[in-house]
Amino acid sequence: MDHHSKAKELLQQRDELDGKIKELMLVLETNNSTMDSPLLDAEGYPLNTIDVYAVRHARHDLICLRNDRAALTEKIVVEMENENKEVSGQTATSEEKPVHRTSNEPFVKISSVVELSPADIGGFRKDDLIIQYGNLHHGNFNDMQEVAQITKQSEDKIIRVTVIRENRPVRLEICPKKWSGPGLLGCNIVPISGANV
């Protein structure tokens, strides 16, 4: 199987995961619950206003599916990059031009992520250090307005992001979109101390 076909197959698998994630998110929303909201009352009894069993299972499955999605995304990026190497000047599934970073030095970081937001579903985690955000990197970053502009221009589109997490690079695909919370991402991105802001 060639790289394009493999990437397409992986994308289909990820779409299926996204569908399951949405179903599980609906279970939590229906029960007015989040990933860490209480399931017991003050006396230690299960709340009778929610389906405790369903919420517990939804939380567990969401954690598993998020991990599976992150692993799939990394495989997809690898297949796309391999295809790009074979087909000069052609991009697999993205209109983004290749970005050549001058360094792997982070320039902004994630200070908080709202549960079940586009940022959360896309794989952002608190304290992720961003070394590439679309075509932005440490070498061409000037101010936070650039991050906001890329986010706004990429509504309902994929932004390729590379972060440093636990001292290793992690590639993500973030899709800014309108959701039940504020903004298009549901996370707080702040400049790193010493960055050119």
Swiss-Prot record:
GO CC terms, sorted: cytoplasm; nucleus
Key word Nucleus present: no
GO biological process: proteasome regulatory particle assembly
Residue span, PDZ domain: 75-166
PANTHER family: 26S PROTEASOME NON-ATPASE REGULATORY SUBUNIT 9
Physiological role: Acts as a chaperone during the assembly of the 26S proteasome, specifically of the base subcomplex of the 19S regulatory complex (RC).
Protein's UniProt name: Probable 26S proteasome non-ATPase regulatory subunit 9
